[in-house]
Amino acid sequence: VDTLTTSRNALDFAERFRKEGVSNLSLVFRGWQSGGISKADYDTLKVGSGIGKENGLSELKKSVEKDGRFYLATEVVTANDKQINLRSEAVTAITSKLAVINAQDNDVMFPETYFAKPNKVIDRITRLSKRFDSFNLSFVGLGAYLYSDYTRDASVSRLKFKKQVEKTVSAVKQGVAFGNINSYLWQYADEYFDIP
């Protein structure tokens, strides 16, 4: 896995912005997990060594939070077929097929992205918030998607999933951010990004 931006690079960017008079930054760091954005196992809680390990993230956080906010961003709703077991961890649509997002560009590394089962999403949020309790977290995709799982004998309705998400997110102690947020999560958000 090639590292495009290390924690040191991000720290340099933040300091450059500060010198230019830009303050109150919200820096959202993606791809920090071992394996990066596309190859990190869905369940991994390991910080990638190429980005500067956890010490580098802590140093970056300390600097940014002098006059802004810092978030570790991670996808909790979708995953590619290398990140989850499609048979046991992906959502089944009402058609009895896997719920999938197909990219319009077949040249991308993973043209198909699958939705994780609601219990996987809830477990991931809980584990991330406990393991990285000193960091604010941005849950990519969580605010944008609310879905049902029609797995035989284990179905979960959208309403039930919504209630599970609300209960779980309301228990997170650190700052929380979302992208493309649905209104039901606004009350739990310290910040939200990517508003259409």
Question: What feature does the model see in each segment?
Answer:
Residues V1-L25:
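Carbohydrate-recognition beta-sandwich/jelly-roll modules
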Residues N24-P196:
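Aromatic- and carboxylate-enriched substrate-binding clefts and catalytic-loop regions
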